[in-house]
A protein has these predicted regions:
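N-terminal acidic leader/helix
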Residues: 2-31
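Charged, low-complexity interaction regions
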Residues: 18-28, 42-50, 66-73
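Generic L/I/V-rich hydrophobic alpha-helical segments across diverse proteins
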Residues: 10-13, 30-38, 57, 61, ...
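Amphipathic alpha-helical binding modules
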Residues: 52-87
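General helical secondary-structure elements
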Residues: 8, 14, 22-23, 50, ...
């Protein structure tokens, strides 16, 4: 597991969650994603599952930051529920 990449993603999520210019729903989503992603550091997960989770969160980060008019879907790792986050 690449802890440096996870740490970098966590920093981006935490910064997004604290930006006043970001929509409150997005800030909450970023904070929730950071919490879930931080659990990966302490959890031993299957490599393919990890890659899928990482891909989902990278897409979520990019969409939160660059595509404000579109909703994003991210996976909650514990319950595999889907969340749709709107502007």
């Amino acid at each position: 597991m690449d802890y440096q990449k996870i740490s970098d993603l966590l920093v981006k999520l935490i910064l997004l969650s604290r930006q006043e210019s970001v929509h409150p729903v997005r800030r909450t989503a970023a904070a929730d994603a950071a919490y879930l992603y931080s659990e990966l550091i302490d959890r031993d997960v299957d490599t393919m599952h990890y890659k899928q989770i990482k891909s989902d969160f990278v897409n979520a980060i990019n969409n939160l930051k660059y595509n404000p008019g579109e909703y994003i879907t991210s996976l909650e790792t514990k319950k595999d529920k889907q969340y749709e986050i709107f502007q």
